[in-house]
């Protein structure tokens, strides 16, 4: 019995967006994997949250746990999005005329290093501030970060259309609003579950409600602003959108929520 195409796309997203082992007995498909990126984000964020809880329970200092969790997130994604962040920062610094050339350069420039440093420091500060609320915040940030490229693909042309080895297939095979269905299912589930948690007085419903409201803004604004500045999007700017939205979401949650 052949697996449905959506399941093969999910298996493809699992391989493409993470370093996790492939699913046995299922041939992955890669044409429409972007729609499942938010689901993969929840898995990766869940693993980060799990590590946080295990180490905190083992009486590790919060500062050490924070560094390990951020390192785990970078490793689980294969550095894919961080590489895109650095390349995009270098491209923006070079100006629109030399943007793609700078982004294609295998050498990382000063702007790329600066962007990476700022993002990591902001994530560290945010997680330290969130404290016990960090595990839920990691899940929320990972989800919204992977939603950001969906808006970029819907709104902007691909800058390297036709070039081999690029992420242009994300736009080529997309089917309009259907690409947002998996993410919408997660939001619908969250909106259904949160009220029941509030009834039983679960304290962390504040994080869920704030995350649903806070994360949506950067998920749209970051890819929108990047697309306008670059004149379109590429695989690098998709990755940059993921990292920037994750970081901004964590920062906003840290600012708006009481210390955990």
UniProtKB/Swiss-Prot annotation:
| Biological process annotations from GO | cobalamin biosynthetic process
Parts of the chain that traverse the membrane:
3-23, 36-56, 60-80, 108-128, 133-153, 180-200, 206-226, 239-259
User: Pathway, per UniProt?
Assistant: Cofactor biosynthesis; adenosylcobalamin biosynthesis; adenosylcobalamin from cob(II)yrinate a,c-diamide: step 7/7
EC category name: transferase
Q: What is its EC number?
A: 2.7.8.26
The alphabetized UniProt keywords are: Cell inner membrane, Cell membrane, Cobalamin biosynthesis, Magnesium, Membrane, Transferase, Transmembrane, Transmembrane helix
User: Can you say where in the cell this protein is located?
Assistant: Cell inner membrane
**Required co-factor?**
Mg(2+)
Q: Give the Gene Ontology MF terms in alphabetical order.
A: adenosylcobinamide-GDP ribazoletransferase activity; cobalamin 5'-phosphate synthase activity
Membrane topology annotation? Multi-pass membrane protein
One of the record's GO cellular component terms? plasma membrane
Please name the InterPro entries in this protein's record.
CobS
- What does the record give as the reaction this protein catalyses? alpha-ribazole + adenosylcob(III)inamide-GDP = adenosylcob(III)alamin + GMP + H(+); alpha-ribazole 5'-phosphate + adenosylcob(III)inamide-GDP = adenosylcob(III)alamin 5'-phosphate + GMP + H(+)
A Pfam family in this protein? CobS
Main subcellular localization, coarse class?
A: membrane
Q: What does this protein do?
A: Joins adenosylcobinamide-GDP and alpha-ribazole to generate adenosylcobalamin (Ado-cobalamin). Also synthesizes adenosylcobalamin 5'-phosphate from adenosylcobinamide-GDP and alpha-ribazole 5'-phosphate.
Q: Which PANTHER family match?
A: ADENOSYLCOBINAMIDE-GDP RIBAZOLETRANSFERASE
Q: Which family does it belong to?
A: Belongs to the CobS family.
Name the chain's protein: Adenosylcobinamide-GDP ribazoletransferase
